[in-house]
């Protein structure tokens, strides 16, 4: 049985773990009955400068079921919704344009479902892009296709990796899990204002690419999608410019 417990308030000056387990006991959860404890959120209440508090939300896997109706802070945890499904056309190639967050996670999902994502990116892979960007900062000579805006990871690669969204989606947990698996700090999963950090973000992007490749995906960098060929309201082909050779196909 998995349950969530919210609004656990602990003074910043107290032993956090000890106080959390005290609150769990008050809500019918003994330490002996806990199989696993996971932080879902941690925020700070700093309205009173002399009494700053942490506020926690936890997910707890219990060894034995308990009666949730007795405790207002407890609720049944949601089941995983991002299940794997069978591909309609397994091993079919699907084009993905761009390696920003949308492109990378689209490619990952397609690969998980058994498709072969073919990813086209006008810029360079992240390590080469970083060298090109440093060269631009030093010389002011711009590579129009690989720079601070374009290249693996998208424009956000040179941000501090803040993880903001205005939507409430059940898939956010999946995204965070993938980021952590690819090298992000586990704290992003439960911090109120999570961010990865620029240096770590580059590692995460590279590892995410390698995971997609391990599932059968293919990446073509320095490949600019110039146009889309449409016939009878169906996409038939992509027109690609190979940036280095200037060849079109």
Each language-model region and where it sits:
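Beta1/beta-strand and adjacent pyrophosphate-binding region of the FAD-binding site
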Residues: 87-102, 118-120
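Short beta-strand "acidic-cap" motif of Rossmann-like dinucleotide-binding folds
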Residues: 115-122, 126
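A conserved short coil-to-beta-strand element within the FAD-binding core of flavoproteins
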Residues: 38-44, 221-236
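Core beta-strand elements of the Rossmann-like FAD/NAD(P) dinucleotide-binding domain
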Residues: 243-249
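Conserved N-terminal/central alpha/beta ligand/cofactor-binding core
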Residues: 4, 49-51, 128, 134-219, ...
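Aromatic pocket-lining residues of Rossmann-like dinucleotide-binding sites
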Residues: 109-110
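Extreme N-terminal leader/targeting segments of oxidoreductases
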Residues: 1-92
């Amino acid at each position: 049985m998995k349950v969530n417990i919210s609004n656990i308030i602990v003074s910043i000056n107290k032993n956090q773990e000890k106080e959390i387990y005290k609150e769990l006991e008050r809500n019918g959860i003994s330490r002996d009955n806990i199989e696993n404890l996971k932080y879902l959120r941690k925020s700070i209440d700093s309205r009173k400068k002399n009494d700053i508090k942490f506020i926690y939300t936890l997910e707890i896997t219990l060894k034995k079921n308990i009666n949730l109706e007795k405790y207002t802070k407890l609720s049944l945890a949601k089941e995983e919704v991002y299940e794997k499904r069978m591909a309609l056309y397994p091993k079919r190639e699907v084009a993905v344009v761009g390696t920003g967050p949308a492109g990378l996670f689209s490619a990952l999902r397609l690969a998980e479902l058994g498709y072969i994502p073919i990813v086209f990116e006008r810029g360079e892979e992240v390590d080469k892009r970083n060298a090109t960007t440093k060269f631009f900062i030093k010389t002011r000579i711009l590579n129009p296709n690989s720079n601070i805006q374009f290249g693996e990871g998208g424009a956000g690669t040179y941000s501090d990796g803040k993880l903001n969204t205005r939507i409430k989606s059940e898939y956010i947990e999946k995204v965070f899990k993938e980021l952590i698996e690819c090298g992000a700090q586990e704290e992003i999963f439960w911090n109120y204002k999570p961010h990865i950090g620029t240096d770590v973000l580059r590692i995460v992007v590279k590892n995410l690419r390698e995971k997609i490749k391990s599932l059968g995906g293919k990446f073509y960098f320095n490949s600019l999608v110039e146009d889309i060929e449409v016939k009878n309201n169906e996409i038939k082909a992509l027109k690609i410019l190979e940036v280095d050779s200037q060849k079109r196909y």
